[in-house]
């Protein structure tokens, strides 16, 4: 009986998908783009840090644009044609990332802002004094 290596057993095959969801998580320090199928299974992801931006350059709109272009290009190689976009977070890269996705040629069915907003929940942390 041949022994199957642990890596090949754990690693799933590259999933091809035609319709997916693109999640944009725009924080103040980084922008993370995750592409999932309609069930929520992650197909691929990209971030400003993974695209080579380090330190304060990671939080720029240009870094978010590069991360979005990288993620959409890789997902189109896997067959993505139509997508929904979920944007979360108040970061500076949210609009630029969405603009990059719109330019890429993927058909967007809708764009939804899913940033969590408290209905007067927990007390926020005190303001910074610099």
Swiss-Prot record:
InterPro entries, sorted: Ribosomal_uS11 (IPR001971), Ribosomal_uS11_bac-type (IPR019981), Ribosomal_uS11_CS (IPR018102), Ribosomal_uS11_sf (IPR036967)
Keyword Membrane carried by entry: no
Alphabetical keyword list: Chloroplast, Plastid, Ribonucleoprotein, Ribosomal protein, RNA-binding, rRNA-binding
Disulfide bonds: none
Compartments it resides in: Plastid, Chloroplast
Any single GO BP term: translation
PANTHER family linked to this entry: 40S RIBOSOMAL PROTEIN S14/30S RIBOSOMAL PROTEIN S11
Cross-referenced NCBIfam families: PRK05309.1, uS11_bact
Assembly and oligomerization: Part of the 30S ribosomal subunit.
Protein name: Small ribosomal subunit protein uS11c
Originating species: Marsilea quadrifolia (European water clover)
């Amino acid at each position: 009986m041949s022994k199957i290596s642990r890596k090949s057993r754990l690693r799933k095959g590259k999933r091809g998908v035609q319709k997916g969801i693109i999640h944009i998580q725009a924080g103040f320090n980084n922008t993370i783009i995750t592409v999932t199928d309609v069930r929520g299974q992650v197909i691929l992801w990209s971030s400003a840090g993974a695209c080579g931006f380090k330190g304060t350059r990671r939080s720029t709109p240009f870094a978010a644009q590069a991360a979005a272009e990288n993620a959409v290009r890789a997902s189109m190689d896997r067959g993505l044609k139509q997508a929904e976009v979920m944007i979360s977070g108040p970061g500076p890269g949210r609009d630029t990332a969405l603009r990059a996705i719109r330019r890429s040629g993927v058909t967007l069915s809708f764009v939804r802002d899913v940033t969590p907003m408290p209905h007067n929940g927990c007390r926020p942390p005190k303001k910074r004094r610099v």
